[in-house]
Amino acid sequence: MTSSEIAMPGEVKADPAALMASLQLLPSPTPNLEIKYTKIFINNEWQNSESGRVFPVCNPATGEQVCEVQEADKVDIDKAVQAARLAFSLGSVWRRMDASERGRLLDKLADLVERDRATLATMESLNGGKPFLQAFYIDLQGVIKTLRYYAGWADKIHGMTIPVDGDYFTFTRHEPIGVCGQIIPWNFPLLMFTWKIAPALCCGNTVVIKPAEQTPLSALYMGALIKEAGFPPGVVNILPGYGPTAGAAIASHIGIDKIAFTGSTEVGKLIQEAAGRSNLKRVTLELGGKSPNIIFADADLDYAVEQAHQGVFFNQGQCCTAGSRIFVEESIYEEFVKRSVERAKRRIVGSPFDPTTEQGPQIDKKQYNKVLELIQSGVAEGAKLECGGKGLGRKGFFIEPTVFSNVTDDMRIAKEEIFGPVQEILRFKTMDEVIERANNSDFGLVAAVFTNDINKALMVSSAMQAGTVWINCYNALNAQSPFGGFKMSGNGREMGEFGLREYSEVKTVTVKIPQKNS
């Protein structure tokens, strides 16, 4: 599922009048959503934090408080790690469980997510500000597919026999690492929760996971579904809290064997340092990006404009994959800018629960201010502000879709990850030039190229210093393909078969035998 292809029912028409007439075909948000789960989830039980502290959870569309959630700190992390270690101990129910049964539990969890899909999508919109239909058709679709994908892998992770010299029989085993600490971001709360727990549980690990303090509600709801699905106590523990306390405790905990983090490069560095200083726990990092999107003159212009638009503005621009450095070949530059501005001006910004809304609010006041400050830096440094550039409305954290032209590589908006609805359009003359400029970044998460020349496409894709390259598409992510970054965009891979390698150890076993026969 891609950001620009929301799979709505076929009967829903494309033109606005027909769309409004057929809205009854679309799913509806859960009315008067009750927030049931606001406590820490340890050992399949809901608990108050040891400190008794709570923190507010807000609706970014209004700025108003939704509820308060128990705040986990180091003491609570210690309790969760103890529960996870007990669940992982030799002879435990979880360790003795058949791999096929682990797969069945993941499939059952997917069934429960499908049952509660509208409720979870409502929660993602209420707590995270994303349009409900995008949450329902993209985020929740990704959650379900990821759970089912790894459910299918559970009993298919095989070792091998190795023909070594001498009278020996040698084979390998793929074993779970142990207790996995996981820290997830606020931009895709439920999807990132699933990206983390699904491969870990598939391999037989146990989990201590911290959702972002801005968006803990859907992760806590998943705790109830995990218990209902039948996962044993202690296998998954969910602890909402802040990075400097709960997150730091996970990163440095001696009882945690592996950590996976999605978030900023700055915090990723701190986590890798803490992992090294403590017990050299294994680390997977999915960090920031400043991704190049290269548009050649022979591309389908209307299609490239729409894909580039979605590649930046999807999810309010709050994507690590955002194609925010759009390099356009000189001969089509002015026309591309013109059409991009027209498209941005048509983008509908509004309530996440309005079915016509394309863009909701930024996550909070801090992020809102950061985006507006970077927009002002673009103006100050000489980029041409084609449209947008301001906050929108009296309530909430909405920002106008913003387009800059005449952007140069040395500007802050061309170098720093904005994480907001801001499109920067740069021009280039030659392939060699654009390859060098596209790679001239500390980041290397994704890249894209739009062209009708397959030789040009393959040449550029092989030259890009990025973990994923899209040709004539953008944000085409799926459960089957590995995802991760080069350079300061992180290390390790999530998703696909490669994602399993991050959650298992390979053990070699050699047996002395009386006589070997080939």
From Swiss-Prot:
Instruction: Establish whether keyword Metal-binding is in the entry.
Output: no
- What residues bind NAD(+), as annotated? 184-186, 210-213, 264-266, 366-370, 417
Top-level enzyme category = oxidoreductase
**Mainly resides where?**
cytoplasm
**Any one GO molecular-function label of the UniProt entry:** 3-chloroallyl aldehyde dehydrogenase activity
The UniProt keywords, alphabetically, are: Cytoplasm, Lipid metabolism, NAD, Oxidoreductase, Phosphoprotein
Q: Which family does it belong to?
A: Belongs to the aldehyde dehydrogenase family.
Which protein is depicted?
A: Retinal dehydrogenase 2
Task: Please name the source species.
Answer: Mus musculus
What taxonomic ancestry is recorded? Eukaryota, Metazoa, Chordata, Craniata, Vertebrata
